[in-house]
Amino acid sequence: MEQTKYRMELVLLLGLISMLSFIPASIAAEEGQEHDNLTTYIVHVKKLEIEGPLQSTEELHTWHHSFLPETSNKDRMVFSYRNVASGFAVRLTPEEANALQEKEEVMSIRPERTLSLHTTHTPSFLGLRQGQGLWNDSNLGKGVIIGVIDTGIYPFHLSFNDEGMPPPPAKWKGHCEFTGGSVCNNKLIGARNLVKSAIQEPPYEDFFHGTHTAAEAAGRFVEGASVFGNARGTAAGMAPDAHLAIYKVCSSKVKDECPESAILAAMDIAIEDGVDVLSLSLGLGSLPFFEDPIAIGAFAATQKGIFVSCSAANSGPHYSSLSNEAPWILTVGASTIDRKISASAKLGNGAEYEGETLFQPKDFSSQLLPLVYAAAEKNNSSALCAPGSLRNINVKGKVVVCDLGGGIPFIAKGQEVLDAGGSAMILANIENFGFTTLANAHVLPAVHVSYAASLAIKAYINSTYTPTATVLFQGTIIGDSLAPSVAAFSSRGPSQQSPGILKPDIIGPGVNILAAWAVSVDNKIPAFDIISGTSMSCPHLSGIAALLKSAHPDWSPAAIKSAIMTTANTLNLRGLPILDQRLQPADIFATGAGHVNPVRANDPGLVYDIQPEDYVPYLCGLGYSDREVTIIVQRSVRCFNVKSIAQAELNYPSFSILLGSDSQFYTRTLTNVGPANSTYTVKIDVPLAMGISVSPSQITFTQVNQKVAYFVDFIPQIKENRGNHTFAQGAITWVSDKHVVRTPISVIFK
């Protein structure tokens, strides 16, 4: 009964989503008119100086309530944080917030912000095969708990069945907030809703995002998965036998859809519950780490040995457009896979331009139809096929060219064409999107084509009085040799907050990804859909991290990150450098270390390890104040007493050098996780306009877990050698008879 009721609610919500209208619930409805000016604030306070930890949650709440105005009531407290921060979220008036700021114990107080979501075949594409390699060594992730912080989940999907799965590990402390005892199981072991609203509800999906990301990370094997008959095969996440814990932090039913206070609360509870991996496909943009809730929460998680994977954001191809930049986070960009859901635009002059679409109706005629680009007849709004823009334009029975952009969802553009009587749509890329095309479940026959194709199609329209076109459908095609390539939307580095740390760290599958969906888009059950974004690449890496954690339970979060980065692929299936959306070699700020190779990451040979305490000198070196560092690390820090280090001195599995006229000298320490007796020789790919000296040029290990340091001198050359280049890239690679350990280098010229 509960499942049927939820399906009905989701169908109604899907209709609302298609109209792009949400009706938010009022968080403060029950508090009365006198509290209309209350705002949620995030408050960081000094740790209570007592011997040992607080004895109970009640003691913590009592202490936090002591900061509140005497006239306020307990309903003002939104969350008390125990693990991720020394502080709480509370609803105050601006005057009360100003008064609280004056208290000596208060280190920081500011209004909370709203975070944004970063919205079958991939296991095979990544080399994961049943009974072999990493899937075999890790038992498909068995015993590892992945915490997914997202929009909730549709728990009844077959991707979350628990057939043959053991109970969760004894360390698991979480619980399930779904009503009915059979909703959670040995696969979906916990689910919480952290979004505070007038009516508290179970953590059901209402954004059509969290179900997909959870299934990508750890969905079970489901045969016969497809959407509109395309991408048919067996669906599976990266770690099919890992346990899932779901933390809902976003809801369409509240004003601030992904509130910061809920995200901190989810990370706080996940740490307490005992997760091994945290996956967050959301972000706030670039913020100082002491103001970034994910950076603060992730540091606390890292201290507990929890691996944190986050999406890089979808603001590419612009430089310095990243979210989630902290070095203790794995920052994941998006790449294509070798599967295309292919279609083409055929013009009256005989030319055909390849593209993609998910909706491929078999009854659509290949007969040529009149072709129109509405911008030539009206204005920019009609060129974008904005809602209502085609109302007074004759598009009935025609193929309509719609430009990408304008903040208008792809599906909404097609809906406008359909409502105006159009027969088909050609979705035309703008320059920034280049050759990146997406397969969407359009509402009418459509094809998404590249920027080069869009220019050619518009030139054809202008060349004749009677332009015609149609859309041809080719279905699923596997074997695109240009994969992986970097998606146009994938956010790029360098990091704004810490340019001395290379970001993103890695790229992974994030374009046209099939996974579980809450409501069927093609009237088939179980439901699947194909969507794109760094939101999709993040859970791929979260699942891969879970596999590595299962195969190597003694590895630290930093060691797992190092294994992923130093074994990454830098070539596509054709054996050429990975390309970007222009079909040009992608630079290091697009790819980071490269494209994830989970099979090689399982046996990296060497790793760069970092302990949580090592980040303190780095944070002081960023110029943060004692108070700001204390907010992040949750203990009193005086940078005067800490030997600060430059950003590039952190023992990171990459180098990011800000190079002026002086040489720079850095040390790295490698830990042997390969054969006890092994020798590595250095190979240097020297970046443009500089020299590199590495000493020693050969390193030998005689024990497992032995550590050996090496030293690197970065030597600038004359500025004229740089030409117009503002940065350069290269690599230091350690090679043995069994392993290749690549450390990428970015150089930003000052």
UniProtKB/Swiss-Prot annotation:
<dbReference type="Pfam" id="PF17766">
    <property type="entry name" value="fn3_6"/>
</dbReference>
<dbReference type="InterPro" id="IPR023827">
    <property type="entry name" value="Peptidase_S8_Asp-AS"/>
</dbReference>
<feature type="active site" description="Charge relay system">
    <location>
        <position position="209"/>
    </location>
</feature>
<dbReference type="GO" id="GO:0048046">
    <property type="term" value="C:apoplast"/>
</dbReference>
<feature type="glycosylation site" description="N-linked (GlcNAc...) asparagine">
    <location>
        <position position="37"/>
    </location>
</feature>
<feature type="glycosylation site" description="N-linked (GlcNAc...) asparagine">
    <location>
        <position position="136"/>
    </location>
</feature>
<comment type="similarity">
    <text>Belongs to the peptidase S8 family.</text>
</comment>
<feature type="glycosylation site" description="N-linked (GlcNAc...) asparagine">
    <location>
        <position position="724"/>
    </location>
</feature>
<dbReference type="InterPro" id="IPR003137">
    <property type="entry name" value="PA_domain"/>
</dbReference>
<keyword id="KW-0325">Glycoprotein</keyword>
<feature type="signal peptide">
    <location>
        <begin position="1"/>
        <end position="28"/>
    </location>
</feature>
<dbReference type="GO" id="GO:0009610">
    <property type="term" value="P:response to symbiotic fungus"/>
</dbReference>
<keyword id="KW-0052">Apoplast</keyword>
<dbReference type="GO" id="GO:0006508">
    <property type="term" value="P:proteolysis"/>
</dbReference>
<dbReference type="Pfam" id="PF00082">
    <property type="entry name" value="Peptidase_S8"/>
</dbReference>
<dbReference type="InterPro" id="IPR036852">
    <property type="entry name" value="Peptidase_S8/S53_dom_sf"/>
</dbReference>
<keyword id="KW-0732">Signal</keyword>
<feature type="active site" description="Charge relay system">
    <location>
        <position position="150"/>
    </location>
</feature>
<comment type="function">
    <text>Required for arbuscular mycorrhiza (AM) development during AM symbiosis with AM fungi (e.g. Glomeromycota intraradices).</text>
</comment>
<dbReference type="GO" id="GO:0005615">
    <property type="term" value="C:extracellular space"/>
</dbReference>
<dbReference type="InterPro" id="IPR000209">
    <property type="entry name" value="Peptidase_S8/S53_dom"/>
</dbReference>
<dbReference type="InterPro" id="IPR010259">
    <property type="entry name" value="S8pro/Inhibitor_I9"/>
</dbReference>
<dbReference type="InterPro" id="IPR037045">
    <property type="entry name" value="S8pro/Inhibitor_I9_sf"/>
</dbReference>
<keyword id="KW-0378">Hydrolase</keyword>
<feature type="glycosylation site" description="N-linked (GlcNAc...) asparagine">
    <location>
        <position position="462"/>
    </location>
</feature>
<dbReference type="Pfam" id="PF02225">
    <property type="entry name" value="PA"/>
</dbReference>
<feature type="glycosylation site" description="N-linked (GlcNAc...) asparagine">
    <location>
        <position position="677"/>
    </location>
</feature>
<dbReference type="InterPro" id="IPR034197">
    <property type="entry name" value="Peptidases_S8_3"/>
</dbReference>
<dbReference type="InterPro" id="IPR041469">
    <property type="entry name" value="Subtilisin-like_FN3"/>
</dbReference>
<dbReference type="GO" id="GO:0004252">
    <property type="term" value="F:serine-type endopeptidase activity"/>
</dbReference>
<keyword id="KW-0720">Serine protease</keyword>
<feature type="domain" description="PA">
    <location>
        <begin position="370"/>
        <end position="456"/>
    </location>
</feature>
<feature type="glycosylation site" description="N-linked (GlcNAc...) asparagine">
    <location>
        <position position="380"/>
    </location>
</feature>
<dbReference type="GO" id="GO:0036377">
    <property type="term" value="P:arbuscular mycorrhizal association"/>
</dbReference>
<protein>
    <recommendedName>
        <fullName>Subtilisin-like protease 1</fullName>
        <ecNumber>3.4.21.-</ecNumber>
    </recommendedName>
</protein>
<feature type="domain" description="Peptidase S8">
    <location>
        <begin position="125"/>
        <end position="602"/>
    </location>
</feature>
<keyword id="KW-0645">Protease</keyword>
<dbReference type="Pfam" id="PF05922">
    <property type="entry name" value="Inhibitor_I9"/>
</dbReference>
<feature type="active site" description="Charge relay system">
    <location>
        <position position="535"/>
    </location>
</feature>
<feature type="domain" description="Inhibitor I9">
    <location>
        <begin position="40"/>
        <end position="118"/>
    </location>
</feature>
<dbReference type="InterPro" id="IPR045051">
    <property type="entry name" value="SBT"/>
</dbReference>
<keyword id="KW-0964">Secreted</keyword>
